């Protein structure tokens, strides 16, 4: 018998049935491009604001804060120096927001159209409008998140959230009280916490945990790349893997030392050939929401003494830019390996300053026990070392960034 062509409708039916019987290996990646912005500190200095007072207030806040209240954790980041943000969508149809992807916290929040008239910082940001979303679900629970620069307050709501092309139903914060500093001048609207559930305020399940529960990712990891070149792509967050275009060699992993936090043990800090600190071990948090590297004030003083740096401006150590080429390397010992920053890695020039001073991206930060003392490895470190956060194996991987 001669072969008969199968009708188009039958082909479509066969294709549909086959497509639904494929193996469940449909895991993928989510990719969020990041933009680099001037920090709030840079903008304030450009406008002639005295940063000494603001930095002093931040220091007093840390001294007075209680770090033992697990139901309302204090986030160490103050966002004065944060420079990288990416876009997400909330609602149906999607409302777009610029957010910081912050491993130091675990909640998602954005400003609300219900923000009070006294909080003028809300006026310059994209505001979430629940009345414009057909997928909005009321919650109403009040929440407060304490940051280094103050606190944000509001209430919880539920809606669909789109991150890197992945859609989840998410409880998030609608902020109705937003501090003037830093948010009045911030280029970002809100914060998407990439921390653990234990870090979340009010027991809210974090966005990344909801994504993990859908089993759509190739691996239970996310990775962060921060560009060193301001005129290029600001950076990238990859959900479910890493991007070999932005790193070279292999990852080397360090196990998390504290459950429920992106905290690891650091076994030494060196200036040039001399190991000065942490030989017996120090706690260090890898924080994508922080710009600088920070550590106990006494430790930073030792480092600056070894560098020959004495001058401070508004809690920042500064040197004449002509001295930068003479500054030695600073190395951090993590997981049996040495991670070295050259002077070009840890010194930066504020484009808005008209003097010859360069800023060292190293700050003193005294966190009282039991949370501290702790070091914070922020964007200054991540720019040099592409970083992968592995939830499945509770570890952090570092590779040399391209």
From Swiss-Prot:
The protein's superkingdom reads Eukaryota
Residues carrying sugar: 69, 139, 320
User: Which N-terminal residues, if any, form the signal peptide?
Assistant: 1-26
The active site is formed by: 102, 287
**Major site of localization recorded for this protein:** secreted
Protein EC: 3.4.23.15
Boundaries of every Peptidase A1 domain copy: 84-399
- One Gene Ontology term from the biological process aspect of the record: amyloid-beta metabolic process
A single GO cellular-component term from the record reads: apical part of cell
Which InterPro entries does its entry note?
Answer: Aspartic_peptidase_A1, Aspartic_peptidase_AS, PEPTIDASE_A1, Peptidase_aspartic_dom_sf, Renin-like_dom
Indicate yes or no for the key word Disulfide bond.
yes
Q: Does the keyword Signal apply?
A: yes
The residues of the propeptide are 27-64
Q: Which top EC class applies here?
A: hydrolase
Q: What does this protein do?
A: Renin is a highly specific endopeptidase, whose only known function is to generate angiotensin I from angiotensinogen in the plasma, initiating a cascade of reactions that produce an elevation of blood pressure and increased sodium retention by the kidney.
Quaternary assembly: Interacts with ATP6AP2.
Protein name (record)? Renin
């Amino acid at each position: 018998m001669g072969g008969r062509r199968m009708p188009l409708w039958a082909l479509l039916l066969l294709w549909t049935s086959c497509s639904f019987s494929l193996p469940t290996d449909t895991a993928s990646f989510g990719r969020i491009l990041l933009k680099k912005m001037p920090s709030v500190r840079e903008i304030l200095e450009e406008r002639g604001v005295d940063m000494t007072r603001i930095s002093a207030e931040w220091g007093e806040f840390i001294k007075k804060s209680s770090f033992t209240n697990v139901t309302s954790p204090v986030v160490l980041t103050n966002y004065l120096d944060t420079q990288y943000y990416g876009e997400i969508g909330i609602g149906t149809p999607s409302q777009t927001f610029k957010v910081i992807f912050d491993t130091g916290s675990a909640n998602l929040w954005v400003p609300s159209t219900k923000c009070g008239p006294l909080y003028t910082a809300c006026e310059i940001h994209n505001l979430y409008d629940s009345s414009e979303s057909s997928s909005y679900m009321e919650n109403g629970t009040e929440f407060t998140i304490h940051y280094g620069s103050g606190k944000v307050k509001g209430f919880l709501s539920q809606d669909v959230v789109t991150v890197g092309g992945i859609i989840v139903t998410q409880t998030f914060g609608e902020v109705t009280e937003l501090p003037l500093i830093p948010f009045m001048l911030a280029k970002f609207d809100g914060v998407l916490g990439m921390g653990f559930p234990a870090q979340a305020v009010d027991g809210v399940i974090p966005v990344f945990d909801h994504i993990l529960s859908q089993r759509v990712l190739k691996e239970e990891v996310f990775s962060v790349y921060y560009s060193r070149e301001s005129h290029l792509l600001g950076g990238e967050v990859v959900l479910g893997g890493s991007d070999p275009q932005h790193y070279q060699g292999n990852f080397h992993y360090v196990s998390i030392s504290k459950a429920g936090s992106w905290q690891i043990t650091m076994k030494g800090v060196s200036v040039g050939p001399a190991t000065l600190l942490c030989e017996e071990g120090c706690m260090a948090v890898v924080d994508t929401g922080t710009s600088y590297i920070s550590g106990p004030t006494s430790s930073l003083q030792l480092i600056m003494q070894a560098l020959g740096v004495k001058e401070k401006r508004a809690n920042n150590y500064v040197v004449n830019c002509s001295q930068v080429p003479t500054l030695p390397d600073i190395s951090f010992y993590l997981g049996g390996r040495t991670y070295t920053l050259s002077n070009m890695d840890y010194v930066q020039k504020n484009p808005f300053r008209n003097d010859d001073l360069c800023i060292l991206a190293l700050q003193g930060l005294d966190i009282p026990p039991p949370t501290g003392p702790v070091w914070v490895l922020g964007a200054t470190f991540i720019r040099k070392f592409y970083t992968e956060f592995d939830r499945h194996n509770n570890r952090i991987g570092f590779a040399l960034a391209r």
